Amino acid sequence: RSPNHLYSVSLEQLARRAGQDPVAYRRALYEKAGAKRHLAVLDLAADKAGWGEPAPEGWTRGVAVHESFGSVVAQVAEVKMENGEPRVGRVVTAIDCGTAISPNQIAAQMEGGTCYGLSAALYGQVTLTEGRVDQTNFDTYRVLRHNEAPQVETYIVAQPAGTHPTGVGEPGTPVIGPAVANALLALTGEAITAQPFVKV
């Protein structure tokens, strides 16, 4: 899933061309637009991820924000290169989904959506040889394995009583790809505008 990819990667490039911190750049835009929910998730994710502090040695961070199904999600991904491929170790997620009916279920949905989106962003492709699909089952179609799954932390923006609940089923999916791409831009200096990041 990549409905947010090009937008977030372009925003990251603009921040870097302006010589600004990616979180500070987004914050200024959200403040100017009066996008309070976007600002709240961005600030919460950045704070919990330790944005502004050095990442662990060898790792770098990327950020992305997206609104879907009435919810707003921000993610900070910690990424490094390992054997020539991106490795995502930690993802900090902040979500505004209105009234949080079941916080544990929200966290589970964010974990599953993040891993699903990460699998698609890293590996999701179908190739053809002489007009025939090469990937006929999961032994030939690469997906994210359990040992590749990152640690996912989920934080929920508190809302006043009476705020209606919004979606949590899919909003965790479209954010992770651009968050990883933006970390890779910080790491390599190269913008990634297409998925998957790892080619067959």
Predicted regions and their residues:
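Cofactor-binding beta-sheet edge motifs in enzyme active sites
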Residues: R1-V200
